[in-house]
């Protein structure tokens, strides 16, 4: 059964109806519309915690979607799933692919930084301060890029950059 037929709450039903109306009136080709349906169903499954199902929908959307920006969002959402399941290496791979296709994704840059920071913490806990600091430096680089794109976001990252001496004066202005 298509995911769109499973939506049983008012908000999901409303979103589905509106998305279907927009799909019908948008001047786009059938393949792009079909890709969006899979993407929408992937988001719905992801929101319900049905990660395996969401990944299937996203994979199908990737095979159909030709727009690089949209492909970037699909890869980003797939990265979210892998990160939430603890597969940080796969999440990093997908976030990097997303940024290659759509460089205006500060949320992907932030998530890369979060993973590098987490890995840095783990290295330091294991007693490898040098590896931990190297990962912190990588996290800082990605947070700086994210903050430059969205200066009103990532306040905790901005504070971390300042308190660790990794901020650059022009980052915040």
From Swiss-Prot:
The keyword NAD does not apply. InterPro entries: PSI_Ycf3_assembly, TPR-like_helical_dom_sf, TPR_rpt, Ycf3/AcsC/BcsC/TPR_MFPF. It is found in: Cellular thylakoid membrane. One of its GO terms (biological process) is photosynthesis. It comes from the Bacteria. TPR repeats lie at residues 35-68, 72-105, 120-153. Its main location: membrane. The keyword Thylakoid applies. GO terms for cellular component: plasma membrane-derived thylakoid membrane. It is a peripheral membrane protein. Keywords: Membrane, Photosynthesis, Repeat, Thylakoid, TPR repeat. Essential for the assembly of the photosystem I (PSI) complex. May act as a chaperone-like factor to guide the assembly of the PSI subunits. Belongs to the Ycf3 family. HAMAP family: Ycf3 (MF_00439). NCBIfam families: PRK02603.1. This is Photosystem I assembly protein Ycf3. It comes from Nostoc punctiforme (strain ATCC 29133 / PCC 73102). The lineage of its organism: Bacteria, Bacillati, Cyanobacteriota, Cyanophyceae, Nostocales. The gene is ycf3.
